[in-house]
UniProtKB/Swiss-Prot annotation:
Entry keyword set: Aminoacyl-tRNA synthetase, ATP-binding, Cytoplasm, Ligase, Metal-binding, Nucleotide-binding, Protein biosynthesis, RNA-binding, tRNA-binding, Zinc
EC nos: 6.1.1.10
Example of a GO MF term: metal ion binding
Lineage: Bacteria, Pseudomonadati, Pseudomonadota, Gammaproteobacteria, Enterobacterales
Position of sequence motif 'KMSKS' region: 332-336
Name of encoding gene: metG
Cellular localization per UniProt: Cytoplasm
UniProt: Zn(2+) binding residues: 146, 149, 159, 162
List of residues binding ATP: 335
Family to which this protein belongs: Belongs to the class-I aminoacyl-tRNA synthetase family. MetG type 1 subfamily.
Reaction equations catalysed: tRNA(Met) + L-methionine + ATP = L-methionyl-tRNA(Met) + AMP + diphosphate
This protein's name: Methionine--tRNA ligase
Motif 'HIGH' region: chain residues: 15-25
Subunit structure: Homodimer.
Function, as annotated: Is required not only for elongation of protein synthesis but also for the initiation of all mRNA translation through initiator tRNA(fMet) aminoacylation.
């Protein structure tokens, strides 16, 4: 390889140890695994770690409900999580737990360094207390209306609607999530991390250009609203680590959870003689450190975590790689509808690599939500993996094995076509490296189309019947096998198990840097089925089992779908009428509330060379308009401008839903560009 080998440490967010892994979790772990596998293929020294987040009140309470010790519950869950990740081919070098000796030592060390450096303060606070359960209530065990946007049923630390952060005591009409009673105020001494002391450092880190633009924009918003001291302690009863020299006080789970990245790596270092902890975590480390996380935990990873590391003299992350949520069939995952799918349920019915491929085909470096459309899932996997890639090997291997004893031709039949495939390595590699996996998949499938077109045009099944054309037949089919090898090498980070089967069939490793040398006069092995089609019945079984599991757990039955009943299909129009509507992909460059209107947002849209101003009545659904900035949507571009009291509206954005808070802005798949027509 020509590039300089790097030392890289990669982590995924730590799954919480009180529940099973589901397909929402798997998006992140698959995204990270694809990136890690590509980096390994290019010769980088990369270590991939994770752990269970094993502390906190939820774990303590669930263990009580089960009648077992928290340690027993988290050990069982850790084994289940590791089994699920292994089933999806997630190639962790180490999977640990935050309830470990290493994590306690590191948490204590970091706390003591922060305290010695003057970044830990203590003061008496008024805290919500559940008089029925005789316990102070953590943030996530108090619910009420958000003090900023007044959205109901929000947790005590942050609002999932507007993104605001606050204290539990700020909630409107708070209730205990443990007992349902109204909590009372009690005083307690707590310890605080002086986050505001790191404001300038954090601003500089944000401006460095390393972070995703959407993350940097959100951090700037937090800076403008002012950083607050962070409560890092909790009162007994609590399952976690005790604060040194403070009996009855425990580290808040979000203090020791990210330290779990460090302790999981330290645990790996103890197992291997060739690794040094300081080489990756020392403040002057030259290694790269990347955290793959979901957008729901950006606040903790972009503010608290870097500041904690800075204040305790450890290195900060090189970057955060943030992704969006997973929806199923265009809606939030639902247990009652069977679309809240556990990893183990999926694996019992479907090949893990089908989901790996589908997620890869949709993922990008942006923080966009990914929709698992089950019909599209079946169609895309069957069309791409089975029909385009595997079928390329199948339709050529038979002739090579039967007519030429498995031996490929001594020359390449179409050197220009082979060069096209090999030269694509740079662009495809750049796409993998920059986490633009959807682009990588598009480029790989475009090559697969070229390969199949070549075979169709050369028609080896016809050549095989013509006397005296044995050499032509061998050359054509060998070319098909050569192109299959290149495709499978490119797909290896996404489909590692299929790549292993392809490697056995081809009798040669699939190495990125070896592609320029074709397999000449090489003997392949007899072809065996490499991949199976997805049948609709398999997907139906996953949904039904998931629905039954939810029912057994006491989840409410799904309400009948009523969208059509509430909004009947409009009268039929002819095609000419529809063709008059010019819909385009648009990038939301800016989103603002409209002073004097409680319904409208002002959107500045980029159509790829021109800007439009649109007023849209979606404010109730998006009370924090900045969450829309940087998002792609669909707009009607040729709608006549409309003069409104607040200005000129130059089009209309497309959304679904009955109105009010139930409005869902439409977004195209990753890969669409501003200005593209929607057909």
């Amino acid at each position: 390889m020509t590039q300089v080998a790097k030392k890289i440490l990669v982590t995924c967010a730590l799954p919480y140890a009180n529940g099973s892994i589901h397909l929402g979790h798997m998006l992140e772990h698959i995204q990270a695994d694809i990136w890690v596998r590509y980096q390994r293929m290019r010769g980088h020294q990369i270590y991939f770690i994770c752990a269970d987040d094993a502390h906190g009140t939820p774990i303590m309470l669930k263990a009580q409900q089960l009648g077992i010790a928290p340690e027993e519950m988290i050990n069982e869950m850790n084994l289940e999580h590791q089994t699920d990740f292994a089933g999806f081919g997630i190639s962790y070098d180490n999977y640990h737990s935050t309830h470990s000796e290493e994590n306690q030592q590191l948490s204590t060390l970091i706390y003591q360094r922060l305290k010695e450096n003057g970044f830990i303060k203590s003061r008496t606070i008024s805290q919500l207390f559940d008089p029925e359960k005789v316990m102070f209530l953590p943030d996530r065990f108090v619910k009420g209306s958000c003090p900023k946007c007044h959205s109901p049923d929000q947790y005590g630390d942050n609002c999932e609607v507007c993104g605001a952060t606050y204290n539990p005591t700020d909630l409107i009409n708070p209730k205990s999530a443990v007992s349902g009673t109204t909590p009372v105020m009690r005083e307690s001494e707590h310890f605080f991390f002086d986050l505001p002391a790191f404001s300038e450092m954090m601003r500089a880190w944000t401006r460095s250009g390393a972070l995703q633009e959407q993350v940097a924009n959100k951090m700037q918003e937090w800076f403008e609203s002012g950083l607050q001291e962070w409560d890092i302690s909790r009162d007994a009863p609590y399952f976690g680590f005790e604060v040194p020299d403070a009996p009855g006080k425990y580290f808040y789970v979000w203090l020791d959870a990210p330290i779990g990245y460090m302790s999981a790596f330290q645990n790996l270092c103890q197992k291997r003689s060739d690794l040094r902890f300081d080489e990756f975590w020392d403040v002057d480390s030259k290694a790269d450190l990347y955290h793959f996380i979901g957008k729901d935990i950006v606040y903790f990873h972009s503010l608290f975590w870097p500041a904690m590391l800075e204040g305790s003299h450890f290195r900060k992350p090189t970057n955060l790689f943030v992704h969006g949520y997973v929806t199923v069939n265009g809606a939030k995952m639902s247990k009652s509808r069977g679309t809240f799918i556990k990893a183990s349920t999926y694996l019992a019915h479907l090949d893990a690599e089908c989901l790996r491929y589908y997620y890869a085909a949709k993922l990008s470096s942006r923080i966009d939500d990914i929709d698992l459309n089950l019909e599209d899932f079946i169609q895309r996997v069957n069309a791409d993996i089975v029909n385009k890639v595997v079928n390329l090997a199948s339709r050529n291997a038979g002739f090579i094995n039967k007519r030429f004893d498995g031996q490929l031709a001594a020359t390449v039949a179409d050197p220009a076509l082979y060069a096209t495939f090999v030269n694509a390595a740079t662009s495809i590699g750049d796409a993998f490296s920059s986490r633009e996996t959807s682009r990588a998949i598009r480029e790989i499938m475009a090559l697969a189309d070229l390969a199949n077109r070549y075979v169709d045009e050369q028609a080896p099944w016809v050549v095989a019947k013509q006397e005296g054309r044995e050499a032509d037949l061998q050359a054509i089919c060998s070319m098909g096998i050569q192109l299959f090898r290149v495709l499978m090498t490119y797909l290896k980070p996404v489909l590692p198990s299929l790549a292993e089967r392809a490697k056995a069939f081809l009798a040669t490793p699939l190495d990125w840097d070896d592609l320029s040398a074709p397999l000449l006069s090489h003997r392949i092995r007899p072809f065996k089925a490499l991949f199976s089609r997805i049948e609709a019945a398999q997907v139906d079984a996953v949904i039904e089992v998931s629905r039954l599991e939810a029912a057994a757990a006491g989840e409410p039955a799904a309400a009948p779908a009523g969208a059509l009943a509430e909004a009947p299909i409009a009268p039929t129009i002819n095609f000419d009428d529809f063709a008059k509507v010019d819909m385009r992909v648009a990038l939301i460059k800016r989103a603002e509330s409209v002073k004097g209107s409680d319904k409208l947002l002002k959107l500045t849209l980029d159509l790829g060379g021109t800007s439009r101003q649109v007023f849209s009545g979606i404010r109730a659904a998006y009370p924090d308009p900045q969450v829309l900035e940087g998002r792609l949507t669909i707009m009607v571009a040729n709608l006549a401008p409309r003069k409104m009291r607040f200005g000129i509206s130059e089009g209309m954005v497309m959304a679904a839903g009955p109105g009010g808070k139930d409005i869902f802005l439409l977004s195209p798949d990753a890969g669409a560009l501003p200005g593209m027509p929607v057909k």
